Amino acid sequence: QGEKNLRELNWAPFPVSPKSVELILVTHAHTDHVGYLPALVRDGFAGEILATQATCELAAIVLRDAAYLAERDAEHAAANGYSKHEQPLPLFTEADAERTIGLFRAIDYDSDIDLGDGWTARWTRAGHILGSASIRVATPSASVVFSGDLGRAEHPVLRAREIPPGDRKSVV
């Protein structure tokens, strides 16, 4: 998906072994936030994927659809000879997507989730899409907030975004 140089990045080796990753925190279910997860699972990731309940449910739909389309695209490329590869492959399969969906664990908004070693994570409503959140990760000595994508302060359909707890010392 996207420009050629970005598509090629999907096929490059991940910078660390996916087997070494223990946990993934997800802000929302748009493809640019969850679409590579099945490739990580295919390559050995077996930890938990934490997200809000709505994000877990939407991600299941998005990933099944993306896998279906990727498999059909590969079949179409093979049948019509427009791939430079002798046997075009999808980035991930429907089986990879199903294994990924099985790793999702739903968490509640505004609850500190123990990540171990004194680290916690807290999801706060982002108002971007159903289930979206900013995630605050805190250690005993510091914290950082990853916003993902933010919605409007006053949204006509979704609950408005909320400000994550904690001090604001730096904004990047």
Q: Where is each model-derived feature located?
A:
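Pre-active-site segment of Zn-dependent metallo-hydrolases
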Residues: 1-47, 51-104, 150-161
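A general structural motif
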Residues: 21, 46, 141, 166-167
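Catalytic core of the metallo-beta-lactamase
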Residues: 106-165
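Conserved small/polar residues in nucleotide/adenosyl-binding loops
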Residues: 169-172
